C-alpha cells in the first residue's frame, strides 16, 4: 500500500476517544511513520520499544545491510488520541529478541502493550498471525473486524 492509501485508512474512526497507537517503524521510514500518525488523528509521544535483534541460531547480534550503517534496531512508536491511562510504570523499552520470519515482530511486544495499557479492546493492523485477546486485520490473516471499511490487498504469490 502507498503512504496515501495508508493515510486514508479509517483508523481515526476505529480508535476509541482515549486510545494509544503502537507503530513499528524502521529508521529510514520515520518521516512516513510520523505522517501516518498525524493522518490517523494521533499525537506522537515517544519511542515505546526498541527491538535489538539477535541472530536466530547464534548468540550474536543480527545486522542488516542498512543504508548508511549496518542496521540492527527497529523502533515501535507510541502515539495517543485523547488521554489514555498508563496502567504500569515498570515496562522496559528494550526488547532483545531473535529475528524470526521476514518482518515478524517479537511476540512479547503484545504482552508489554497489554501490561502498559491494560486489558482493553485492541486490534493489530497488518497482522501476520492471530493472537489471543487481539482483533486482527491484514492480508495474512482472516480479519476479525470486517466492518473496518476497506480491504487489505492480498499478497501476490509468484512462482
Q: What is the meaning of each model-derived region?
A:
Residues 1-159:
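Class I S-adenosyl-L-methionine-dependent methyltransferase catalytic core
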Amino acid at each position: 500500500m502507498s503512504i496515501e492509501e495508508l493515510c486514508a485508512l479509517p483508523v481515526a474512526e476505529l480508535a476509541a476517544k482515549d486510545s494509544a497507537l503502537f507503530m513499528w517503524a524502521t529508521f529510514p521510514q520515520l518521516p512516513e511513520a510520523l505522517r501516518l500518525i498525524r493522518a490517523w488523528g494521533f499525537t506522537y509521544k515517544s519511542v515505546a520499544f526498541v527491538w535489538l535483534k539477535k541472530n536466530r541460531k547464534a548468540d550474536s547480534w543480527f545486522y542488516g545491510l542498512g543504508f548508511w550503517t549496518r542496521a540492527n534496531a527497529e523502533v515501535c512508536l507510541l502515539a495517543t488520541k485523547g488521554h489514555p491511562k498508563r496502567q504500569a510504570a515498570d515496562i522496559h523499552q528494550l526488547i532483545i529478541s531473535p529475528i524470526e520470519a521476514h518482518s515478524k515482530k517479537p511476540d512479547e511486544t503484545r504482552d508489554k502493550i497489554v501490561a502498559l495499557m491494560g486489558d482493553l479492546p485492541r486490534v493489530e493492523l497488518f497482522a501476520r498471525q492471530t493472537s489471543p485477546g487481539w482483533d486482527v486485520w491484514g492480508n495474512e490473516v482472516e480479519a476479525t473486524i470486517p466492518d473496518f471499511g476497506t480491504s487489505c490487498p492480498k499478497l501476490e504469490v509468484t512462482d
